[in-house]
């Protein structure tokens, strides 16, 4: 397991996601102040935001002012969440893992209760009074 590579890949994915969030913010702002430009940006962005850096590069070629605006918003979002994001991620993963384990254990327990083993069935129906009558 290459932790440095995992960290790099995670950072790149997070950058792209923050680019997407910045785009949503700018689209909302433009929707109120310049609807035609918001429509243009929406159409331009369709299917292109998966790689945030490539998206910004392509937007620079078309409308540098919008690229700069999205970059500024993205940076602001990153600065605002950087302080508490690592703890939130770790806590979120721990809680999700615990919940999934609990659900799995419940399913396993329900399956074993609904399909008792032959030994447990025999013990269930074993009554000393009935056993004595059989002898």
Curated annotation (Swiss-Prot):
Select a single GO molecular function from the record's annotations and give it: protein homodimerization activity
Keyword DNA repair listed? The answer is no
Q: Does the keyword Cytoplasm apply?
A: yes
One Pfam match, by short name? RbcX
Which keywords accompany this UniProt record? Bacterial microcompartment, Carbon dioxide fixation, Carboxysome, Chaperone, Cytoplasm, Photosynthesis
Which parts of this chain are annotated as the region Disordered? 103-135
Tell me, which GO biological process terms does this entry list?
carbon fixation; photosynthesis; ribulose bisphosphate carboxylase complex assembly
Q: Where in the cell is it found?
A: Carboxysome; Cytoplasm
Q: Name one GO cellular component term.
A: carboxysome
Major location, coarse class?
other
Record's family?
A: Belongs to the RbcX family.
Known role:
An RbcL-specific chaperone. The central cleft of the RbcX homodimer (RbcX2) binds the C-terminus of an RbcL monomer, stabilizing the C-terminus and probably preventing its reassociation with chaperonin GroEL-ES. At the same time the peripheral region of RbcX2 binds a second RbcL monomer, bridging the RbcL homodimers in the correct orientation. The RbcX2(2)-bound RbcL dimers then assemble into the RbcL8 core (RbcL8-(RbcX2)8). RbcS binding triggers the release of RbcX2. Required for optimal reconstitution of RuBisCO upon expression of rbcL-rbcS subunits in E.coli.
Q: Relate the assembly described in the record.
A: Homodimer. Interacts with the exposed C-terminal peptide of RbcL ('Glu-459-Asp-468'); binds 1 RbcL peptide per homodimer. Contacts a second RbcL monomer via its peripheral polar surface. A slightly longer RbcL peptide binds to RbcX2 with a higher affinity.
The name on file for this protein is RuBisCO chaperone RbcX
Source organism per entry reads Anabaena sp. (strain CA / ATCC 33047)
């Amino acid at each position: 397991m290459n932790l440095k590579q995992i960290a790099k890949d995670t950072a790149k994915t997070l950058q792209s996601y923050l680019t997407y969030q910045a785009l949503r913010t700018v689209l909302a702002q433009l929707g109120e102040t310049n609807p035609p430009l918001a429509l243009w940006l929406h159409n331009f962005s369709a299917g292109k935001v998966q790689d945030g850096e490539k998206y910004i590069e392509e937007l620079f070629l078309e409308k540098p002012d919008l690229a700069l605006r999205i970059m500024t918003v993205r940076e602001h979002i990153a600065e605002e969440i950087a302080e508490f994001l690592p703890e939130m991620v770790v806590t979120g993963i721990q809680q999700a893992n615990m919940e999934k384990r609990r659900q799995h254990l419940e399913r396993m327990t329900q399956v074993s209760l609904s399909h008792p083993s032959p030994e447990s069935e025999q013990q269930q129906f074993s009554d000393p009074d009935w056993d004595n009558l059989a002898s």
